[in-house]
Design a protein with these regions (language model features):
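Helix-loop interface residues and adjacent transmembrane-helix termini in multi-pass membrane transporters
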Residues: 87, 114, 180-183, 217, ...
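Hydrophobic faces of transmembrane alpha-helices in multi-pass small-molecule transporters and flippases
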Residues: 64-68, 91-98, 148-180, 198-202, ...
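Small-residue-rich transmembrane alpha-helices that serve as helix-helix interface/gating elements
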Residues: 121-132, 194, 261-265, 298, ...
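Interfacial/gating helices of multi-pass transporter permease domains
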Residues: 1-16, 155, 159, 175-197, ...
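Alpha-helical transmembrane segments of multi-pass membrane transporters/permeases
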Residues: 37-46, 83-109, 162-165, 221-228, ...
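Helix-loop junctions and terminal segments of transmembrane helices
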Residues: 18-37, 196-218, 279-282
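Hydrophobic transmembrane helix module of multi-pass membrane transport proteins
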Residues: 45-161, 265, 269-272, 277-278, ...
Length: 346
């Protein structure tokens, strides 16, 4: 658990630096690409410059280059995926994802035996190498045009802050757990989080499908209902079935059983949050997303510290669920309020 916790602590730092550098967030790219606005090369240029700066900063702070290379890999991944989804090139999207997922265990495990945790990080960075060719192609197809940014700076800036807040929201738990509760607890929590992330794959796929279609004005009500129903089923699996299987696969992670039961309760709220995030992005109302993430973060940080000290990793899991529920409730309220006001205007 300790080594696993250390790895995820470093990955959380990489994640934050990545999205600080990533001016053109993936969601922004999806929305504007779906609307046929040739803004991709401009976002690529600025984000890659930011990534190089992040690389240098991480080197001076940690005296290591592996995490810097991973930052560049994450940035390239986000830029390319945003373009593919915005253009609705779902076959190419699947191809790139499969290549990266196949390379991850091959390179990660292969380099781990030679270089330890540092090798795993190098392996992750190299798994994104195929994405770089798409970046080069994008620069060839579209010229850099900063005027496209200035016309849309409000939405871009709000969405940048939303993405950055969301990233901090997703990584702050590791930054809190490591120094306060320890690497062993972080290891158990990180494994639980990885399992939850696997269970949210359906949500992520639906979400990435919904954004470009909703931005293009298509009706996605049936897909929303299907997403909610699938997550109700996954919650049942996470609460009752997964805890029965885990001890045979991860005998050293006994604390994970109760954590998974608790954290699986966040699956439905997270799917609801994704549904309304897509709606707000399509409407270019990223301010709602930013506020929702801020409220969720304001719940997560204090409760994670207090509950973590009082109840250990179980308290951390409870905090995670509370933050997810709060975010979903806020989005539902704001969506209904906006719909009501919009109908009055009409």
């Amino acid at each position: 658990p300790e080594g696993f916790g250390e790895l995820h602590y470093l990955l959380s730092i990489v994640g934050i630096i990545t999205f600080v550098s990533l001016v053109g967030s993936q969601n922004t790219i999806i929305v504007y690409t779906a609307k046929k606005i040739p803004i991709q090369s401009t976002f690529n240029f600025i984000s890659l410059i930011g990534g190089i700066i992040g690389f240098v900063v991480l080197f001076f702070i940690f005296n290591r280059i592996d995490i810097g290379f991973l930052v560049l890999g994450y940035i390239i991944n986000n830029l390319v995926i945003g373009e593919l989804l915005g253009k609705k090139e779902f076959n190419h999207y699947l191809k790139y994802i499969l290549i990266q997922k196949i390379l991850t265990p091959i390179l990660g495990l292969g380099l781990f035996f030679g270089f330890g945790i540092e090798g795993v990080i190098y392996g992750l960075a190299l798994s994104y190498i195929a994405f770089s060719f798409r970046i080069v192609r994008s620069f060839r197809e579209n010229r850099i045009n900063f005027s496209l940014l200035s016309k849309r700076k409000g939405f871009i800036f709000n969405n940048y802050l939303s993405t950055l807040t969301g990233t901090f929201h997703g990584q702050v738990d590791k930054l809190i757990i490591m120094p306060i509760i320890g690497a062993s607890v972080l290891g158990n929590y990180s494994l639980s989080l990885q399992i939850i992330n696997i269970m949210t794959i359906i949500t992520v796929i639906f979400y990435k499908y919904i954004i470009p279609h909703e931005s293009s004005g298509h009706n996605v009500i049936k897909i929303r209902k299907l997403l909610i129903l699938s997550n109700i089923g996954l919650t049942f699996i996470g609460f009752f079935i997964v805890p029965l299987i885990l001890p045979t696969i991860f005998p050293k992670y006994v604390d994970v059983i109760e954590i998974i039961k608790i954290m699986s309760l966040s699956l439905v709220p997270m799917s609801i949050a994704k549904i309304y995030t897509s709606k707000f992005l399509a409407l270019e109302k990223s301010r709602f997303i930013l506020i929702g993430l801020g409220i969720s973060l304001s719940i997560m940080i204090p409760t994670m510290i207090v509950f973590g000290i009082w109840y250990g990793v179980t308290g951390v899991a409870i905090s995670y669920v509370l933050a997810s529920v709060t975010q979903a409730v806020y989005y539902v309220i704001m969506s209904k309020k906006w719909d009501k006001e919009n109908n009055i205007e009409k």
